[in-house]
């Protein structure tokens, strides 16, 4: 997942169309077999937004345990180095908004906690604790 921002205080967001995880988030997606993680983030941003990004800075991770015991990791990057024209995709509607106004939008589940990892140097992990049938968002 990549937070793309500019020098004017804007961030690029995606209003996801997928009914299993709707709401405002940043672009991102899955890693293909034998694909470096940064390359996957760059590719997903291109596919979902039409922008070419570079100089990604790793902010932290989001992680949780799946029901089968496997661990799922999402790497959280940010960059202000991009080129191209913004376009929406089948994943969602893409648009710029002021970072100061971001929390007024309807976030996808967990996005508000992930945003803390993107913005605060005191956090590097958003752990989704799924023990005891609950979904607790923890910052580390």
Residues covered by each model-derived region:
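Charged phosphate-binding loop/patch that engages nucleotide di/tri-phosphates or the phosphate backbone
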Residues: 117-140
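Unchanged
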Residues: 31-54, 64-114, 139
């Amino acid at each position: 997942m990549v937070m793309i921002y500019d020098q004017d205080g804007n961030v690029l967001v995606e209003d996801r169309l997928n009914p299993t995880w709707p709401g405002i988030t940043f672009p991102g997606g899955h890693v293909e077999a034998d694909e470096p993680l940064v390359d996957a983030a760059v590719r997903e941003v291109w596919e979902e937004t039409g922008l070419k990004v570079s100089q990604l800075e790793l902010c932290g991770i989001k992680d949780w345990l799946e029901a089968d015991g496997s661990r799922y990791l999402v790497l959280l990057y940010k960059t202000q180095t991009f080129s191209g024209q913004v376009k929406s995709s089948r994943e969602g509607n893409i648009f710029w908004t002021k970072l100061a106004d971001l929390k007024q939008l309807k976030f996808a589940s967990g996005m508000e906690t992930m945003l803390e990892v993107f913005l605060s140097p005191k956090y590097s992990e958003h752990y989704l604790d799924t023990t005891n049938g609950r979904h607790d968002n923890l910052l580390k």
